[in-house]
Regions:
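Active-site and channel-lining beta-strand-loop segments
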Residues: 2-23
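Active-site-adjacent loop/helix segments that line or gate small-molecule/cofactor pockets in enzymes
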Residues: 1-8, 49-50, 64
Length: 103
């Protein structure tokens, strides 16, 4: 087993600073790389305002409102309502309920 001590971009490093190309990556690193400066800055900025807000109708956040407007402006006119969910499971369950109600 190789103990990882740090990672940057597409590479991981062991305790001896030996560099390995990361073919496994993980959930977020696979698309943006390890320690991506833009992601670090966005996380830092967001964490200074709030970490998490439930957005199931009780509260809204500016980023979710902006995304909903962007989606509505770029989809067919009859697709103008957005409902954000917490996970793929909730999204799938919601889409099944909508399909059942529609048919």
């Amino acid at each position: 087993m190789i103990e990882v001590s740090k990672a940057k971009g597409s590479y991981i490093y062991d305790n001896n600073n030996k560099k390995y190309l990361d073919f496994v990556a993980g959930v977020s690193a696979c698309s943006v790389g390890h320690c991506n400066e833009d992601v670090i800055n966005a996380i830092t900025d967001q964490s200074e305002r709030y970490m998490h807000v439930m957005v199931y109708g009780e509260f809204v956040t500016k980023p979710s409102l902006e995304l909903a407007k962007l989606l509505a402006n770029n989809l067919p006119k009859n697709l103008n309502c957005t409902y954000f969910t917490n996970s793929g499971t909730e999204a799938l369950e919601g889409s099944m309920k909508l399909a059942r109600r529609y048919t």
